[in-house]
């Protein structure tokens, strides 16, 4: 079993930074979310960017030779790039034992991505990852590592049976985190699954699926800790709890797959009901990204269900969705009334379901064209033989009764469905439905993207430290901002998140996203002392907003009324789509549990691969403006800022 990430939209601005105070917090967030902030995994990753690899000769490790060329994935063979990656790992850490994770793929930018997990006595060290990016020339492009290099236990704990019963670990996790699952010694039975000391628990109540436990090591505080990785999915949280294998009241770390956010149809580019009018759209899917939104290779659906998503209301807030209400029309005509004055929300549920289904599908198709496809771990029932694991469309719940004034997205590994919950907001009269604010929907969906790309599709645990989790929130805000740019926008325009749904002028972040340092003064070093992923994410999105506008000013905005990007030689021709492409490619390049500096380097590497570094100076100037220039350094207590750019810029 694997971990899952639950990410959420909402963190209301508060006095978390040393800047002028906010207006009083007037939004009451209610949900059943478990606070795991005390159990972030440690930040351990190193990233060797492309210029470092070239300087120290790592790029001389190659597979069988072939000629370079365009961005086509056919330039690499699977045997070659996996062999190259394996050779690098063996050369870099010759004494480490490891296993190849079965999620390697060649992205549409031509880079092969390979991921490894370190093992000891055949037991995974769960937070050790080695990712290798192999270029189109068959050489190592860049790589990252969080492999453990300390002392190894002298004996195999499985042979000695030197650990507790997994039932005790389950109870320890439940008691420590107050997980709403009932399990009693004597009533819960364990069933071995998958080998490698993995068990399923029968006889519990409260979880969506039977909990599991796997014996793994966790790297922490300079040593290895033998733990039971207990997996419990209770809807608002889908947790991997690392319980000490001997002291079951001690928890070493927690991963939550669920990510919460703040947020006939409003067309793409219309952020909310104040931003434009509803329209009747016909056949809106891209054939490149979807054959049709209502087929999945198994049948034709005359409701809001298809290969990419299944959308329904969920007023009970429960876990089941198959039998929930969806609008149905044999001609696929989904026209339902909605105005902002309508109340209660249930009176316009069909309009809400249709809007959520539309927004989720369009975003799926756009991301597909930008590189988040089957091989990269996207969300589809049927992958049409193109790689990756299927059976994982996105479950889209609107008017979800499990909370208000928020939204969330659960991201399990590739092959298991993502789950989005959109809530009603009670901060205005009449209440507002978050599914009608596209920025919230896109924010949530992007949690699924960043978690699938970072560390590989099979590993949803790679944004589980404080800083990487914060960047997850920042990426989500960034994409939510980019997709509703208007033709006449300039870098002088400010952007907000959640303003319509919350009814709060200025939205739900501490500052609007602005390139004006007076309007938004956030710098890299402002992350010092922050304990909220949303506050950290606001800094990261602020930095990415500088990247966006530097690229737009060089390459233009493009046609904002055209959803599908235009490419030349595999590169988006406008700055808006180029920014999204580089950020997505950077996610796939960066190591598991990245920090700001590593993510910056990965974006610059993405440009080096895609354009041969044509935008190097635009990128460095953007990062440097917010203190993430040459010489900036990560330290969780005292980050080092820098406004320097490289020579030649």
Swiss-Prot record:
Binds 1 zinc ion per subunit. The keyword Endoplasmic reticulum does not apply. Its main location: secreted. The keyword Protease applies. Its cofactor is Zn(2+). Its EC number is 3.4.24.-. Zn(2+) binds at residues 443, 447. PROSITE patterns: ZINC_PROTEASE (PS00142). GO terms for molecular function: metalloendopeptidase activity; zinc ion binding. Residues 19-260 form a propeptide. Glycans are attached at residues 494, 609. It is an enzyme of class 3 (hydrolase). Coiled coil: none annotated. The active site is at 444. Belongs to the peptidase M36 family. Secreted metalloproteinase probably acting as a virulence factor. This is Extracellular metalloproteinase 4. It comes from Arthroderma otae (strain ATCC MYA-4605 / CBS 113480) (Microsporum canis). The lineage of its organism: Eukaryota, Fungi, Dikarya, Ascomycota, Pezizomycotina. The gene is MEP4.
């Amino acid at each position: 079993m694997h971990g899952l990430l639950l990410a959420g939209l909402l963190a209301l601005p508060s006095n978390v930074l040393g800047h002028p105070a906010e207006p009083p917090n007037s939004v009451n967030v209610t949900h059943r979310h478990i606070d795991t902030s005390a159990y972030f995994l440690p930040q351990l990753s190193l990233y060797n960017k492309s210029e470092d690899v070239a300087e120290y000769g790592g790029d001389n490790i190659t597979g069988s030779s072939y000629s370079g060329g365009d961005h086509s994935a056919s330039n690499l063979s699977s045997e070659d790039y996996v062999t190259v990656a394996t050779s690098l790992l063996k050369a870099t850490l010759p004494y480490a034992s490891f296993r190849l994770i079965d999620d390697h793929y060649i992205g549409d930018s031509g880079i092969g991505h390979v991921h490894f997990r370190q093992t000891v006595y055949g037991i995974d060290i769960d937070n050790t990852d080695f990712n290798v990016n192999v270029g189109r020339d068959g050489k190592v492009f860049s790589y990252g590592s969080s492999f453990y290099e300390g002392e190894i236990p002298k004996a195999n704990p499985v042979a000695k049976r030197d650990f507790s019963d997994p039932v005790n670990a389950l109870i320890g996790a439940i008691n420590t985190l107050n997980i709403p699952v009932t399990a009693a010694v004597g009533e819960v039975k364990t069933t071995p699954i998958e080998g490698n000391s993995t068990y399923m628990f029968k006889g519990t109540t409260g979880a969506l699926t039977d909990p599991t436990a796997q014996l793994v090591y966790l790297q922490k505080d300079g040593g290895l800790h033998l733990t039971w990785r207990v997996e419990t999915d209770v809807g608002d949280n889908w947790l991997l709890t690392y319980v000490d294998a001997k002291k079951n009241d001690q928890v070493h770390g927690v991963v939550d797959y669920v990510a919460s956010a703040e947020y006939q149809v409003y067309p793409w580019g219309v952020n909310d009901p104040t931003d434009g009018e509803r329209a009747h759209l016909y056949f809106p899917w891209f054939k490149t990204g979807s054959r049709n939104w209502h087929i999945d290779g198994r049948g034709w659906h005359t409701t809001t269900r298809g290969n990419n998503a299944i959308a329904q209301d969920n007023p009970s807030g429960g876990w089941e969705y198959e039998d929930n209400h969806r609008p149905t029309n044999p001609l696929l005509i989904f026209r339902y009334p909605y105005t902002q004055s309508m109340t209660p929300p249930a009176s316009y549920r069909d309009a809400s379901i249709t809007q959520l289904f539309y927004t989720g599908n369009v975003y799926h198709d756009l991301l597909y064209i930008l590189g988040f496809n089957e091989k990269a771990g996207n969300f589809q029932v049927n992958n049409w033989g193109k790689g990756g694991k299927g059976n994982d469309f996105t479950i889209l719940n609107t008017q979800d009764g499990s909370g208000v004034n928020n939204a969330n997205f659960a991201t399990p590994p590739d092959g298991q469905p993502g789950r989005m919950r959109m809530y009603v907001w009670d901060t205005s009269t009449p209440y507002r439905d978050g599914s009608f604010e596209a920025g919230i929907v896109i924010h949530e969906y992007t949690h699924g993207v960043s978690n699938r790309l970072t560390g590989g599709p099979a590993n949803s645990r790679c944004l589980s430290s404080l800083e990487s989790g914060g960047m997850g929130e920042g990426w989500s805000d960034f994409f939510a901002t980019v997709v509703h740019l208007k033709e006449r926008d300039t870098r002088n325009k400010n952007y907000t998140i959640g303003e319509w749904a919350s009814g709060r002028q200025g939205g739900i972040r501490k500052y609007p996203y602005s390139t004006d340092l007076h309007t938004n003064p956030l710098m890299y070093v402002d992350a010092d002392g922050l304990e909220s992923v949303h506050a950290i994410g606001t800094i990261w999105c602020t930095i990415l907003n500088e990247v966006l506008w530097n690229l737009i000013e060089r390459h233009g905005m493009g046609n904002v009324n055209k959803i599908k990007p235009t490419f030349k030689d595999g590169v988006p021709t406008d700055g808006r789509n180029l920014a999204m492409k580089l950020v997505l490619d950077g996610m796939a390049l960066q190591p598991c549990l990245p920090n700001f500096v590593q993510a910056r380097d990965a974006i610059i590497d993405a440009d080096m691969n895609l354009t041969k570094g044509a935008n190097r100076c635009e990128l460095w100037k953007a990062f440097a403006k917010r203190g993430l220039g040459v010489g900036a350094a990560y330290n969780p207590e005292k980050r080092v800022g820098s406004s320097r750019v490289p020579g030649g810029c």
